[in-house]
C-alpha cells in the first residue's frame, strides 16, 4: 500500500546513514516530507539528494542532538518551512567499544548518555509543542535489544537504551493524559547490518590487535532466523508506527530482532 504517510512531515535524527537513512528514505517513498537531521554535513545532503532524485520531498538540517540551542533552531526551521510536524523519529545514537564497567571511562559513559538519552529527551522537549499544534502525531524512539536485557561489556549502551524504553512509556502516558493525539513507542532492533558494527571491537586477538566483530557470524549463531537484519526491515517497523495503521498503538515496544529476545533456537552448523 503506497502513500502510507502521505502529507505528513517527519523529522529523522541521525538520518545520514544506517537505520536512520533507511527510515528517511522509506518515509519519503511513502509520501512524507522528511527532515534529515545529522551532524554529518557530507552524507546528510547526499541522502536528501537521493530522495529528491526519486521525486520526493526532503531537506537536510545539520544538528548535534546534544545541543539544546540547536534544537530550538531546528524546530523553528521546521515550523517555518512546513508549518507542522507529524512524526518524530529519535534515532541518533552511538555505541562505544565494548568495555567492562571497571575499564569504562566516565567520559565515554557521559558521551554515550548525552547522545543516546539526553538527545532523545531534547527531541521530545522541543518537538512536542509543535506536534501538539499540528493536532497529533507519532513519536518513535530508537532503543535496542540491549535496552531490554543486560549485555556484558556494554553496560553503558544498555543503560542508555533501557532509559529510552522507559522514557518512551512515560511520554506516552503523559501524552495520553493530555489527550493531545500523540502516540509514543520504542523500536528495539537486534543485530542489523549497518556501518556501526565495523566500529565495535570483538577484543584483543592472539596478535594483540583489536579486531572488529564478525557481525554476520554473530547473527548466524545468535539469531533464531540465522542472519542479520537489514536497515530497511527496521524502517518498515518505523513506517507502521508513523502511519495511521498504528492509531491504537502507544507505550509499546516493537522488537525487530530475528527472534533473539524470544528465546534460544537450535544453532546452525
Describe each region flagged by the PLM.
Residues 95-98, 238-239, 250-269:
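Short C-terminal tail/terminal secondary-structure segment
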Residues 176, 181-183, 249-251:
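Short, small/polar-rich loop/turn modules that mediate ligand/substrate recognition or access, typified
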Residues 99-101, 105-111, 139, 219:
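Substrate-binding pocket helix/loop in short-chain dehydrogenase/reductase
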Residues 3-35:
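Canonical Rossmann dinucleotide-binding motif of NAD(H)/NADP(H)-dependent dehydrogenases/reductases
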Residues 124, 160, 168:
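Active-site helix of classical SDR
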Residues 144:
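Residue(s) in the substrate-gating loop at a strand-loop-helix junction
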Residues 129, 173-177, 247:
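Alpha-helical segment proximal to the catalytic Tyr-Lys
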Amino acid at each position: 500500500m503506497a502513500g502510507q504517510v502521505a502529507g505528513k512531515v517527519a523529522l529523522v535524527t541521525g538520518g545520514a546513514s544506517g537505520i536512520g537513512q533507511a527510515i528517511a528514505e522509506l518515509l519519503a517513498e511513502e509520501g512524507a516530507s522528511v527532515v534529515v537531521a545529522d551532524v554529518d554535513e557530507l552524507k546528510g545532503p547526499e541522502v536528501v539528494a537521493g530522495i529528491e532524485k526519486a521525486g520526493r520531498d526532503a531537506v537536510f538540517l545539520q544538528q548535534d542532538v546534544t545541543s539544546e540551542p540547536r534544537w530550538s533552531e531546528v524546530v523553528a526551521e521546521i515550523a517555518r518551512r512546513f508549518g507542522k510536524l507529524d512524526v518524530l523519529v529519535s534515532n541518533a545514537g552511538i555505541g562505544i567499544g565494548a568495555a567492562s564497567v571497571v575499564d569504562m571511562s566516565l567520559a565515554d559513559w557521559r558521551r554515550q548518555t548525552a547522545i543516546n538519552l539526553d538527545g532523545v529527551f531534547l527531541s521530545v522537549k522541543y518537538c512536542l509543542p509543535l506536534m501538539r499544534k499540528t493536532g497529533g502525531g507519532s513519536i518513535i524512539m530508537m532503543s535496542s535489544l540491549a535496552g531490554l536485557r543486560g549485555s556484558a561489556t556494554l553496560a553503558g549502551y544498555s543503560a542508555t537504551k533501557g532509559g529510552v524504553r522507559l522514557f518512551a512509556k512515560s511520554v506516552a502516558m503523559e501524552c495520553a493524559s493530555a489527550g493531545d493525539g500523540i502516540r509514543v513507542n520504542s523500536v528495539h532492533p537486534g543485530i542489523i547490518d549497518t556501518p556501526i558494527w565495523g566500529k565495535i571491537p570483538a577484543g584483543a586477538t592472539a596478535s594483540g590487535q583489536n579486531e572488529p566483530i564478525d557481525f554476520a557470524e554473530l547473527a548466524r549463531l545468535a539469531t533464531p532466523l540465522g542472519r542479520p537484519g537489514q536497515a530497511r526491515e527496521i524502517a518498515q517497523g518505523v513506517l507502521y508506527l508513523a502511519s495511521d495503521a498504528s492509531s491504537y498503538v502507544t507505550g509499546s515496544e516493537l522488537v525487530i530482532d530475528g527472534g533473539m529476545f524470544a528465546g534460544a533456537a537450535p544453532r546452525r552448523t
